[in-house]
Amino acid sequence: MSEFKNVTLIKKANVYYDGKVTSRTVIFADGTKKTLGIMMPGEYTFDTAAAEVMEMLGGSMEVLLPGAETWQSFHEGQSFEVPANSQFSLKIKEVADYCCSYLK
């Protein structure tokens, strides 16, 4: 899906790591949420409350998923899931464009 229709967009950005990771929240009519964002090169760790699906829209990232011992590479067109109430780490070597879907 390259565009979303009939949604509410929160204007205020979600800003992390001194602006190196930013996103905007999109709310759908059924109440589900996604964020569309950009990550600049760096290393980041995030905690989850809800389960998430991270879809790569551009660039790439190395991901250390919860419980994993090895890093995995994800590129444009690929996605990965992160369980609720967990933590995952990212290594970004080039600008990464992503869509994060929050699962209920």
Curated annotation (Swiss-Prot):
What reactions does this protein catalyze?
A: a purine D-ribonucleoside + phosphate = a purine nucleobase + alpha-D-ribose 1-phosphate; adenosine + phosphate = alpha-D-ribose 1-phosphate + adenine; cytidine + phosphate = cytosine + alpha-D-ribose 1-phosphate; guanosine + phosphate = alpha-D-ribose 1-phosphate + guanine
Q: What class of enzyme is it?
A: transferase
Alphabetic keyword roster: Glycosyltransferase, Transferase
Q: Which SUPFAM superfamilies match?
A: RmlC-like cupins (SSF51182)
Q: Which GO terms describe its cellular component?
A: cytosol
What Gene Ontology molecular function terms does this protein carry? guanosine phosphorylase activity; purine-nucleoside phosphorylase activity; thymidine phosphorylase activity; uridine phosphorylase activity
- Kindly indicate whether the keyword Acetylation belongs to this entry: no
Report the EC code(s) recorded for this entry: 2.4.2.1, 2.4.2.2
Q: Which domain of life is it from?
A: Bacteria
Any single Pfam family the record assigns to this protein = Ppnp
Name the HAMAP family on file.
Answer: Nucleos_phosphorylase_PpnP (MF_01537)
Task: Give the record's family classification.
Answer: Belongs to the nucleoside phosphorylase PpnP family.
Functional note: Catalyzes the phosphorolysis of diverse nucleosides, yielding D-ribose 1-phosphate and the respective free bases. Can use uridine, adenosine, guanosine, cytidine, thymidine, inosine and xanthosine as substrates. Also catalyzes the reverse reactions.
Name of this protein = Pyrimidine/purine nucleoside phosphorylase
**Species, as recorded:** Syntrophotalea carbinolica (strain DSM 2380 / NBRC 103641 / GraBd1)
Show the taxonomic lineage: Bacteria, Pseudomonadati, Thermodesulfobacteriota, Desulfuromonadia, Desulfuromonadales
- Per the record, the gene is ppnP
